[in-house]
């Protein structure tokens, strides 16, 4: 008798439960997000050593870890929510900021992943600057300060509600979903979006995705003005505030792309310099080549 291994790397996923994208659930989420928003003023009122640029650095590192580990899209924004909420109530030494970031990813992966990140793996990503026992101690500290309230509402929770209300094909929805998720992750790295409620970030991300994909003209339901008005009615906010959030997201995307292009050009220049050195060291005579 032959034994066949049928194990696969892909994780099985349940179909979307339509009961979870009803208006009743949406209204409950809009009420719940008010209690899970961190304070924007914690840099001035709570933290003595932590600066906005430090948050940017650790957030970028956390995003890279989540991408390399192929975490669920919700893990990174949820981890940043934990980080900001903790920093809103507890002063922290700057030397412990990476430990806090690793701990928040540890907790978020437990909430959203089928196979969560391990403490040992996260310590490796810090070049072993922290130990697993330190991470576990910090985990209890974070849980205590967050009062064990880990079911935070994030922008990802709203995206499916918005797409469900839009007359689109499934393929188009999937493209918008991926673009909006990218915008949400980008917003989580920027300190200027801390004060924005998750519903507004999600609506602004969806609107920016539709605009970037050129899905509508001036007369269609997906025109900038009509879509902004529609989404603002769904989340019960001022259309001008939502439009400002969308423009802020688009501006952040442009600056991020510009920065990435500059880094790419700098790395290309460095590579060209190395190549020139290699060329100058190449023997001009075949007899000089050491096989």
Swiss-Prot record:
Q: Which family does it belong to?
A: Belongs to the cyclin family. Cyclin D subfamily.
Instruction: Tell me where the transmembrane regions lie.
Output: none
On modification after translation, the UniProt record reads: Phosphorylation at Thr-282 by MAP kinases is required for ubiquitination and degradation by the DCX(AMBRA1) complex. Ubiquitinated by the DCX(AMBRA1) complex during the transition from G1 to S cell phase, leading to its degradation. The DCX(AMBRA1) complex represents the major regulator of CCND1 stability during the G1/S transition.
Q: What is its main location?
A: nucleus
One GO CC term of this entry?
cyclin-dependent protein kinase holoenzyme complex
One GO biological process this protein is involved in is:
positive regulation of G1/S transition of mitotic cell cycle
Q: Which InterPro entries match?
A: Cyclin (IPR039361), Cyclin-like_dom (IPR013763), Cyclin-like_sf (IPR036915), Cyclin_C-dom (IPR004367), Cyclin_N (IPR006671), Cyclins_cyclin-box (IPR048258)
Keywords recorded for this protein, A-Z: Cell cycle, Cell division, Cyclin, Cytoplasm, Nucleus, Phosphoprotein, Transcription, Transcription regulation, Ubl conjugation
Task: Please give the organism.
Answer: Xenopus laevis
**Which residues does this entry mark as bearing Phosphothreonine?**
282
| Assembly | Interacts with the cdk4 and cdk6 protein kinases to form a serine/threonine kinase holoenzyme complex. The cyclin subunit imparts substrate specificity to the complex.
GO MF assignments: cyclin-dependent protein serine/threonine kinase regulator activity; transcription corepressor activity
- SMART domains per the record? CYCLIN (SM00385), Cyclin_C (SM01332)
Origin, by domain of life? Eukaryota
Protein name, per record = G1/S-specific cyclin-D1
Q: Where in the cell is it found?
A: Nucleus; Cytoplasm
Coiled-coil region(s): none
Function summary: Regulatory component of the cyclin D1-CDK4 (DC) complex that phosphorylates and inhibits members of the retinoblastoma (RB) protein family including RB1 and regulates the cell-cycle during G(1)/S transition. Phosphorylation of RB1 allows dissociation of the transcription factor E2F from the RB/E2F complex and the subsequent transcription of E2F target genes which are responsible for the progression through the G(1) phase. Hypophosphorylates RB1 in early G(1) phase. Cyclin D-CDK4 complexes are major integrators of various mitogenenic and antimitogenic signals.
């Amino acid at each position: 008798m032959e034994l066949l291994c049928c194990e696969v790397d892909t994780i099985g996923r349940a179909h979307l439960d339509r009961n979870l994208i009803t208006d009743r659930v949406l209204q409950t989420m809009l009420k719940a997000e008010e209690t899970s928003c961190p304070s924007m003023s914690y840099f001035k009122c709570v933290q003595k050593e932590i600066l906005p640029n430090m948050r940017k650095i650790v957030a970028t590192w956390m995003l890279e870890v989540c991408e390399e580990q192929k975490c669920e899209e919700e893990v990174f924004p949820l981890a940043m929510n934990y980080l900001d909420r903790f920093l809103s109530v507890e002063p922290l030494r700057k030397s412990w900021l990476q430990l806090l970031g690793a701990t928040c990813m540890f907790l978020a992966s437990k909430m959203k992943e089928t196979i969560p990140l391990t403490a040992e793996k996260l310590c490796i990503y810090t070049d072993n600057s922290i130990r697993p026992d330190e991470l576990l101690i910090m985990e209890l500290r974070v849980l205590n300060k967050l009062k064990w309230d880990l079911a935070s509402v994030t922008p990802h929770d709203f995206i499916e509600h918005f797409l469900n209300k839009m007359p689109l094909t499934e393929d188009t929805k999937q493209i918008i979903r991926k673009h909006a998720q990218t915008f949400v992750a980008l917003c989580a790295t920027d300190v200027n979006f801390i004060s924005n409620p998750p519903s507004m970030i999600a609506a602004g991300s969806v609107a920016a995705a539709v605009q970037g994909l050129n899905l509508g003209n001036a007369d269609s339901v997906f025109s900038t003005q009509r879509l902004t008005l529609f989404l603002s009615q769904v989340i019960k906010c001022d259309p001008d505030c939502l439009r400002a959030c969308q423009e802020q997201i688009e501006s952040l995307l442009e600056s991020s792309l510009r920065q990435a292009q500059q880094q790419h050009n700098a790395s290309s220049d460095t590579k060209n310099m190395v190549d020139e050195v290699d060329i100058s060291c190449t023997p001009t005579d075949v007899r000089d080549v050491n096989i």
